[in-house]
């Protein structure tokens, strides 16, 4: 029997606010345990929540960027369950009236575009964290309790692990472009639960789903979904039944393992939180937030195609992150050579950043410095080979490309007399190759170019070298 996978994602986006969703405590990651807490975080008697307005604005931004409708009135609800890192005995979330509804994202699937529906986006608080000790005991760190989250719930529209990863990357790109999430997946700022089921091909009835909790990398999401699909298919083929449950992915072994039975909504006994009034969002508020939205990735991609005449591949790479796009654009506007700027940013710069584990925001070579280097190439002052050496110097020592070229005497030689002398000497020393070229062996030409450049220590103008060589070798 052939099976069709059905996949839906619930993505938790940690918002980049200075303070928590219902109190003024810091959201800074990595503080000493229980340092960033207060009576609200600790659920002490009489402590009341006060909603952080910035969280609502970030939620509106996310909704607009994912083509959702914004609910004019939405309420917070208590999601009741017991866990040691949940001090109140409930989580403040949203249920019946979330802030964003009925959106979508379009993803690339091969040469086609597929639309993935977004059921809802709602605001909620994060729980604390259990810290397991070596002696068998566990501590509770409530620094994270009350950190603001958006939960983005997709429709079950994905049919492969690759589609799920494409959707996840698109959403990640959007929330980081918006500046509402730092995107640090290792710290849990962007993580997802994957709901996976399988059904016979041609069937219109979804199978029983399993939820894979808290997967925090694109690689692991793909691996977890692929394993779970294979597990369910094998189970059904062997005569078993898929149980609705929550599972965890073990990245070391590449398998999912049962964690607990999957709860339904009624198990959480949702009801409106009496300590929080409904949030009313006016049209004027939505318009103001919309006017403040940054240029989104898809719009920027299309603009790079038209404004800078870039190939689709270049535009796609350069708009993959907002800092990368900003760096390229500053460089291109300064040097007036967009294609060269794209090549250097995607080539030498990205390679150096990756080799040294540095984010582009912290690049030792600024857009202006790189633009200065490109101008020297375009002006014929240095060759591409010399430019790479100058870039290395800029990376290590800073400064300006023009000053480095002058100080180190790296300007390329365009003097025909000096180049002709080098060509004559090389031809005289390699008459066999000269005869081969004149006999029709064109590939030998590259040998002569290399020898001349070597003799001129890489400083000869390649265009002048080519022209003079052709004349000399023609006899």
Swiss-Prot record:
One biological process term in Gene Ontology: glutaminyl-tRNAGln biosynthesis via transamidation
Subunit and interaction comment: Heterotrimer of A, B and C subunits.
Family matches, as SMART domains: GatB_Yqey
Enzyme class, broadest EC rank: ligase
This protein's name: Aspartyl/glutamyl-tRNA(Asn/Gln) amidotransferase subunit B
Signal peptide feature range: none
GO molecular function, one term: asparaginyl-tRNA synthase (glutamine-hydrolyzing) activity
Superkingdom of source: Bacteria
Family: Belongs to the GatB/GatE family. GatB subfamily.
Catalyzed reactions: L-glutamyl-tRNA(Gln) + L-glutamine + ATP + H2O = L-glutaminyl-tRNA(Gln) + L-glutamate + ADP + phosphate + H(+); L-aspartyl-tRNA(Asn) + L-glutamine + ATP + H2O = L-asparaginyl-tRNA(Asn) + L-glutamate + ADP + phosphate + 2 H(+)
Keyword Protein biosynthesis: yes
NCBIfam families attached to this UniProt entry: gatB (TIGR00133), PRK05477.1-2 (NF004012), PRK05477.1-4 (NF004014), PRK05477.1-5 (NF004015)
Keyword Ligase attributed: yes
Role played: Allows the formation of correctly charged Asn-tRNA(Asn) or Gln-tRNA(Gln) through the transamidation of misacylated Asp-tRNA(Asn) or Glu-tRNA(Gln) in organisms which lack either or both of asparaginyl-tRNA or glutaminyl-tRNA synthetases. The reaction takes place in the presence of glutamine and ATP through an activated phospho-Asp-tRNA(Asn) or phospho-Glu-tRNA(Gln).
Listed EC numbers: 6.3.5.-
Keywords carried by this UniProt record: ATP-binding, Ligase, Nucleotide-binding, Protein biosynthesis
PANTHER family (UniProt xref): GLUTAMYL-TRNA GLN AMIDOTRANSFERASE SUBUNIT B MITOCHONDRIAL AND PROKARYOTIC PET112-RELATED, GLUTAMYL-TRNA(GLN) AMIDOTRANSFERASE SUBUNIT B, MITOCHONDRIAL
HAMAP family assigned: GatB
